[in-house]
Amino acid sequence: MSDDNSHSSDTVNSKKGFFSLLLSQLFHGEPKNRDELLALIRDSGQNELIDEDTRDMLEGVMDIADQRVRDIMIPRSQMITLKRNQTLDECLDVIIESAHSRFPVISEDKDHIEGILMAKDLLPFMRSDAEAFSMDKVLRTAVVVPESKRVDRMLKEFRSQRYHMAIVIDEFGGVSGLVTIEDILELIVGEIEDEYDEEDDIDFRQLSRHTWTIRALASIEDFNDAFGTHFSDEEVDTIGGLVMQAFGHLPARGETIDIDGYQFKVAMADSRRIIQVHVRIPDDSPQPKLDE
């Protein structure tokens, strides 16, 4: 407990020093609490003292201090894994299909994580006899972290210990998901896409236990069916329209609004429309029912 408290104090002090320096250059006086600080950052964006991307990143940096790994992890059901007894060709099939670079390796089931496989470690075997491949030759130690770990501490650990994936466990020692450094960076800079990412035509995609990415063009009817909600589609047909209607204007990326207990955050937008939103469902809500 003392370690967490001392770290929290150091984190708060370092943040206060950074933001005090920044805000002293932009404003007269210092904010007295978090809400005032957020308001000043947003005002600075609206007044064009800082650009939109900088504003979003500053908000993201503040957000990660309030979140736990459980809030951002890839849930167990969404984990793509390899089995310890799989052949080289079987591993390559999974790697090519998923386009991921790191995989938990399991034995019996997802509660039995044997280690982590990095796709690049298979390259030497592709130039020689595939029969020489053995998972034991490429298996790396899996880092295990609790669900309750603070996200800012997780990021610091990723950077200092130079690894990119950790297995998340619950209080009983069962595997509840995994977290990557990319998951944390996306909280700060927005969704990161690479040359392997295809344009997403999936309406609903789970990011963590309570957070989903929603295409703005997804229909309100489909959203209601999946999430058990009762949003009206009398005036607007899509989730993007619902969110814009609630704001009363075209919101910028990073703006957040609460609609009947569901928190909608604009993840992508341009000068004409909302493209994608993140929605956080209430903690006591059942998991959405999606068609396979």
UniProtKB/Swiss-Prot annotation:
Tagged with keyword Transport: yes
Pfam families the record matches: CBS, CorC_HlyC, NMB0537_N
UniProt key word Magnesium: yes
SMART domains with a match to the protein in the record: CBS (SM00116), CorC_HlyC (SM01091)
Annotated organism of origin: Salmonella typhimurium (strain LT2 / SGSC1412 / ATCC 700720)
Coiled coil stretches, renumbered: none
Name of the featured protein: Magnesium and cobalt efflux protein CorC
PROSITE patterns named among the record's database cross-references: CBS (PS51371)
